[in-house]
């Protein structure tokens, strides 16, 4: 191995970046026994929440449950630092139920730092990584370490890049800008150029965050209060992580005609509408300017005022991110009811940054160009702490397996939201920040938050991510659920029982002789909580056990049907494609399909089917070609590597 300078230290794995992806990656590799170093520009801002200090929400909470089911930490920390929790979409079906927690951002960061500091095999270093040490040429390149701004070299067998918005980061307030990854923190230099020099394509994306306002300057008594409604619900499946702390309320205000007119009059002063930058921002988290332009017929938009912690007066003004100049921002804030005397503690800003389009990655999140180099989080074009944490765990896991000469772990899209997200990232040419959504999954009834442990904890155990205590808890939960389902199927409510008339009235259906509690649960108006209320179930049974049993029974027909669909799709979509397949030599493919397939090099037929520009006719042609190759050698149609 040759280095540009003698290595200062050597590690098995180096993680570059101390955000949510980096922390999960570093903890994962360290727990798997690898000597790991996490490099951060600022160790005082570990796992910082620079935008909304919240975890969860639709699809995002499912990701958090999945990460926890695999032994990750984001759910545990969210439970420990939550200052408000709410259940979203509770009136709809379980496929879209979601838990969202407002967290104490400073406490979250401190607890993550403490966790990192007390994790065996894990070292922390504060430095700016500006270069990569790579050996070999072209297709045979392999990572061997990193270089820092001040010239130190650190050796590693695997490197995980989790640079967030810091690569070439530039923050904007109006037309004014400065180099920064986020407000008050320097951008990372050199790494983008290093990646480009290795043959990677990079591009630019944009995100933004709203102003912070002093709570003491807001007339909260004039606004609608939004209290916590889910204090007894948690992200983690481990009861030892459950913390029921004091809950705080959020408040709701709305934009006014004055707000909208101020924005229309000053659109040209933003970096985007003024034509200064053209980076794409997140579709599902638009600035207030975008809302006014896109929904010009809407008279008002809801704005949430969310506390950033128990010991700070800072209020996050959700739904009000803006790229307007600072003086106009204050005018906008004071146009909102209840904020007429608002004191702005921090202005809103947007940030544009370099990212690495994830079609250059394998489903393991290892780069295709450089062996041992992994990428995770916002660097891959995603937005959100939850998306970052999930990718960090996957990248860390597969970095460890690469070093251990084990096969990578690929998460199929039909098995988890983690798999859905990664499949989307590596298969699609995304041009805007990617956010996980329940609508992105074809199998969302199966991929619920409540059953993430049943879907993924056995895998986590096999991979060495779940310890004996967690595994015992998991087995005990399964046994309790099985016993409760059997009880519900065998216990009958008779029409002569005293509670029967009340049950008939509530469900709107008669009881003919008798009915099992399971069939009673299948009635739309009856739920596990109602059984407890009527003395038909044990209220001391853990809530996850009662609700899990209810969902399995109430939706059994739908669940079986969707599982059959998944099994059918699996048989075809998981068919492997040769990694060195030369698509240009398959004459039955369209020109566009050849180009797209050659660029992305999908690992399975299912992944190929989801690449934009690859038609069903192309998939049929590819399938026919694969069948032909069973009787012919592959050599004439593969690339020499």
Curated annotation (Swiss-Prot):
SMART domains in alphabetical order: GIDA_assoc_3
Binding site for NAD(+): 281-295
Keywords on record: Cytoplasm, FAD, Flavoprotein, NAD, tRNA processing
Primary site of residence: cytoplasm
Highest taxon listed in the record's lineage: Bacteria
Cofactor(s) needed for function: FAD
Any one annotated GO CC term: cytoplasm
UniProt cross-references to SUPFAM superfamilies, sorted A to Z: FAD/NAD(P)-binding domain
Binding locations of FAD: 17-22
UniProt cross-references to NCBIfam families, sorted A to Z: mnmG_gidA
Role, per record: NAD-binding protein involved in the addition of a carboxymethylaminomethyl (cmnm) group at the wobble position (U34) of certain tRNAs, forming tRNA-cmnm(5)s(2)U34.
Self-association state and partner proteins as the record states: Homodimer. Heterotetramer of two MnmE and two MnmG subunits.
Family: Belongs to the MnmG family.
Protein name as it appears in the record: tRNA uridine 5-carboxymethylaminomethyl modification enzyme MnmG
Organism field: Synechococcus sp. (strain CC9902)
């Amino acid at each position: 191995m040759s280095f540009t300078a003698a290595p200062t230290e050597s590690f098995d794995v180096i993680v570059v970046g101390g955000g949510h992806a980096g922390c999960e990656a570093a903890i994962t590799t360290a727990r798997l026994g690898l000597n790991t170093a996490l490099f951060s520009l600022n160790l005082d801002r570990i796992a910082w929440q620079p935008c909304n200090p919240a975890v969860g929400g639709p699809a995002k909470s499912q990701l958090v449950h999945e990460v926890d089911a695999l032994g990750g930490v984001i759910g545990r920390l969210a439970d420990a630092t939550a200052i408000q929790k709410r259940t979203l979409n509770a009136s709809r079906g379980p496929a879209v139920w979601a838990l969202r927690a407002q967290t104490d951002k400073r406490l979250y960061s401190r607890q993550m730092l403490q966790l990192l500091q007390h994790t065996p095999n894990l070292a922390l270093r504060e430095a700016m990584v500006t270069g990569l040490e790579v050996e070999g040429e072209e297709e045979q390149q392999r990572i061997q370490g990193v270089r820092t701004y001040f010239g130190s070299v650190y050796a590693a067998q695997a490197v995980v890049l989790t640079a967030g918005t810091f690569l070439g980061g530039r923050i904007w307030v109006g037309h004014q800008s400065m180099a920064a990854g986020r407000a008050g923190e320097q951008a990372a230099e050199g790494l983008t150029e290093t990646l480009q020099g290795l043959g990677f394509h990079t591009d630019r994306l944009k995100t933004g965050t709203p102003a912070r306002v002093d709570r003491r300057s807001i007339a909260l008594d004039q606004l609608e209060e939004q209290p916590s409604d889910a204090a007894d619900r948690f992200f983690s499946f481990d009861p030892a992580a459950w913390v029921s702390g004091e809950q705080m309320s959020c408040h709701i205000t709305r934009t006014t005609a004055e707000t909208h007119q101020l924005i229309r009059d000053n659109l040209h002063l933003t970096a985007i509408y003024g034509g200064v930058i053209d980076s794409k921002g997140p579709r599902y988290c638009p600035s207030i300017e975008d809302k006014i332009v896109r929904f010009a017929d809407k008279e008002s938009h809801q704005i949430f005022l969310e506390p950033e912690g128990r010991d700070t007066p800072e209020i996050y003004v959700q739904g009000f991110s803006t790229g307007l100049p600072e003086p106009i921002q204050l005018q906008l804030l004071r146009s909102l009811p209840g904020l007429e005397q608002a004191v702005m503690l921090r202005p809103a800003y947007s940030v544009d940054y370099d990212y690495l389009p994830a079609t250059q990655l394998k489903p393991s999140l290892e780069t295709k160009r450089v062996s041992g180099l992994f990428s995770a989080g916002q660097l891959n074009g995603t937005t959100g702490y939850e998306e970052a944490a999930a990718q960090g765990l996957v990248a860390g896991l597969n970095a460890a397996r690469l070093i251990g000469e084990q096969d990578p772990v690929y998460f199929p899209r039909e098995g988890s939201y983690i798999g859905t997200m990664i499949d989307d990232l590596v298969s699609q040419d995304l041009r805007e920040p990617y956010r996980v959504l329940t609508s992105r999954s074809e199998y969302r009834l199966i991929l619920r938050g409540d059953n993430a442990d049943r879907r993924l904890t056995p895998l986590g155990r096999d991979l060495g991510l779940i310890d004996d205590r967690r595994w015992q808890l998991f087995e005990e939960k399964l046994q309790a659920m099985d016993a409760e389902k059997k009880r519900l199927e065998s216990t009958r409510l008779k029409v002569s029982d005293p509670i029967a008339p009340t049950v008939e009235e509530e469900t709107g259906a008669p009881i003919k002789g008798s009915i099992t509690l399971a069939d009673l649960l299948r009635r739309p108006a009856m739920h596990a909580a109602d059984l407890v209320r009527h003395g038909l179930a044990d209220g001391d049974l853990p809530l996850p056990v009662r609700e899990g049993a209810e969902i399995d029974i109430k939706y059994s027909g739908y669940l079986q049907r969707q599982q059959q669909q998944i099994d059918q799709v699996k048989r075809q979509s998981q068919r492997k494609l040769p990694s060195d397949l030369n698509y240009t030599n398959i004459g039955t493919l369209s020109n566009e399909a050849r180009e797209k397939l050659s660029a992305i090099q999908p690992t399975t037929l299912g992944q190929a089917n989801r690449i934009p520009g690859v038609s069903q006719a192309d998939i049929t042609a590819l399938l026919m070609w694969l069948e032909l190759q069973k009787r012919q050698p592959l050599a004439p149609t593969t690339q020499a590597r």
